[in-house]
Amino acid sequence: MIGEHKALVQRITNETKIQIAISLNGGHIELPESILDKNPTQENNIATQATTSQVIDIHTGVGFLDHMIHALAKHSGWSLIVECIGDLHIDDHHTTEDCGIALGEAFKQALGQVRGVKRFGCGFAPLDEALSRAVVDLSNRPYAVIDLGLKREKIGDLSCEMIPHFLESFIEAARLTVHIDCLRGFNDHHRSESAFKALAVAIREATAPNGTNDVPSTKGVLM
């Protein structure tokens, strides 16, 4: 995409406190002030990466969720900072759902008007034996169809039922139409990660410039 596509989002409820900085074109981003009491240990910096083209720093309090959001940001080409303080003493539901909602809102704000981009994107991503496909439409018509075929109860400290729910929450808040299918694979970690990477590839294609300044719709608007 051409131009600056950045957003800062805060979402505060009785269940979670979240803040997000995003740049869809990568590059430098920062939060005005961290809400976390972070100690620079290897464990809590597992989803942190900084290069000349991207800054990624994910801290949701749920390790496998951090890992998935990191993969999504990396392969979408985003710079992304996510901080969340959630009621994990209850379970992982509110944190996972609210992070998906907040990330979707941040993406929508950063994207702005759907103009001069391809609009549609398709991505395939393998991870060893697992293969996933994602198809994206920047339609402003939220609809999610997700089939990951997960078998385990949990991966790390994230309930497997919350993995598609995070994706649904993100997709609805971002106002996208997305179909994600894990086509094969027997390891649920691999199935999940390949799905997030496929989504990233599809988003990157959908948001790529199409060589015009037109709205890619016969309606003339996407709203």
From Swiss-Prot:
Its EC number is 4.2.1.19. SUPFAM superfamilies: Ribosomal protein S5 domain 2-like (SSF54211). It comes from the Eukaryota. Keywords: Amino-acid biosynthesis, Histidine biosynthesis, Lyase. InterPro entries: IGPD_sf, ImidazoleglycerolP_deHydtase, ImidazoleglycerP_deHydtase_CS, Ribosomal_Su5_D2-typ_SF. Pathway: Amino-acid biosynthesis; L-histidine biosynthesis; L-histidine from 5-phospho-alpha-D-ribose 1-diphosphate: step 6/9. One of its GO terms (biological process) is L-histidine biosynthetic process. It holds the Pfam family IGPD. It catalyses: D-erythro-1-(imidazol-4-yl)glycerol 3-phosphate = 3-(imidazol-4-yl)-2-oxopropyl phosphate + H2O. It is an enzyme of class 4 (lyase). GO terms for molecular function: imidazoleglycerol-phosphate dehydratase activity. Gene3D superfamilies: Imidazole glycerol phosphate dehydratase, domain 1 (3.30.230.40). PANTHER family: IMIDAZOLEGLYCEROL-PHOSPHATE DEHYDRATASE, IMIDAZOLEGLYCEROL-PHOSPHATE DEHYDRATASE HIS7. Belongs to the imidazoleglycerol-phosphate dehydratase family. This is Imidazoleglycerol-phosphate dehydratase. The lineage of its organism: Eukaryota, Fungi, Dikarya, Ascomycota, Saccharomycotina. The gene is HIS3.
